[in-house]
Regions:
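Cationic, low-complexity basic patches in intrinsically disordered or flexible, solvent-exposed regions
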Residues: 205
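Nucleotide and nucleotide-moiety/phosphate-recognizing core
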Residues: 2-158, 163-181, 188-189, 195-202
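Short, intrinsically disordered C-terminal tails of secreted or membrane-associated proteins
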Residues: 214-217
Length: 219
């Protein structure tokens, strides 16, 4: 398999409680929004099928989906978190396997998918990357039938990913990569850091930031 054989499911809930506003449409330093950056990079990586699993009815979501040729599905049950996005996305997927990716990970390296693909076989339902022992369920491969378990769990009131995953056949795959690839934009501070990194990447001479470990100050 290659990325072209997968569906990319972008999980884009709308609560953003820690951000204080809808982070999906926050402008990044390069002029894109957080969500449009993920969709563009996914399309560039070679995914032919993209599902945008989002919460809420917003004109911007419809326009974004149309711009990147994505199929927009909205969560049937609001405020159910990423579990609902996974369930809705897998129900809409037409391929056997999908990459589920959080819409707030602006630096994810789509080449990592090639490391996961060899594990997607047999009875395995989820290929779950781990980083320093921590699961990365919003950057994992899911077999289409895993969506039924997510839908059933939500129906009985369980929406924690860890609980649902323990009921599936999971293949964990430790990765030795830069933790920044899984960086989430969840807070205003994280947003500022992401914008700074993107701006720095566009400079001919990147600005070096050095922080003192004791005081946290830097130059």
């Amino acid at each position: 398999m290659t990325p072209a054989d997968l569906t990319l499911i972008v999980a884009a809930g709308g609560m953003s409680t820690r951000m204080g506003e809808d982070k999906r449409f926050l402008p990044m330093a390069d002029g894109e929004t957080l969500l449009s950056r993920t969709l563009r990079r996914g399309r560039t990586a070679g995914f032919r099928a993209i599902v945008l699993a989002a919460e809420g009815e917003r004109r911007e979501l419809t326009e974004l989906a149309a711009a990147y040729g994505a199929h927009l599905v909205t969560d049937d049950r609001p405020q159910q978190g990423p579990a609902a996005a996974i369930a809705a996305g897998l129900a809409a997927a037409e391929t056997e396997w999908s990459l589920v990716l959080s819409g707030d990970m602006p630096f994810y390296d789509f080449d990592l998918v090639r490391a996961l693909l060899p594990e997607a076989h047999g009875a395995v339902q989820v290929v779950l990357p781990t980083l320093a022992g921590y699961w990365q369920p919003l950057a994992a491969l899911y077999r289409r039938d895993a969506g039924q378990a997510f839908a059933a769990a939500i129906a009985r009131g369980d929406r924690k990913l860890g609980i649902i995953l323990r009921g599936l056949t999971v293949r964990e795959l430790p990765l030795a990569v830069d933790a920044g690839l899984f960086f989430n934009v969840n807070t205003p501070a994280a947003y500022r850091l992401a914008c700074g990194r993107i701006a720095n990447e566009g400079r001919e001479r990147p600005i070096l930031s050095v922080a003192a470990p004791a005081s946290g100050t830097g130059k």
